[in-house]
């Protein structure tokens, strides 16, 4: 269900910002950006802060790894907007489109390390079933992933399980490939602020 709030209801300064974004990028403002600017005191500011910390804060996971986690969680959730956005960002971050495509097509045969594979497998189960157990954690830890890396991956999962559900509930418009590539470039340069 597409909500009209994504098209209107913004303060004059925000409307000006959106106009400038469209002017300089020659792309429509993504609905994800529109959502965080609508009632920033209620959702937007907190969501941006949490997501930025999960995706760009200190971590043993690279930015590319975390973007791939976001794309993988979004794939499990079947969130078209988020899959496209974070696949584009992971492709640019890794500078390796085939690697990203391989992970999203078949995690078990994809060219990634055991630790990342085990972590993605755990995030996929958590996303699909809403729970993981001690065996899941043992598998991740035995693949060489630290407890802090698990916590960091869970933060990515939390951010994009939330965002993906909002994207689908609000009917986020799927951008053109050029729009997603421009968004990915922005996210890699500026993060989620």
Residue ranges: model-predicted function:
Residues 1-193:
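Hydrophobic alpha-helical segments
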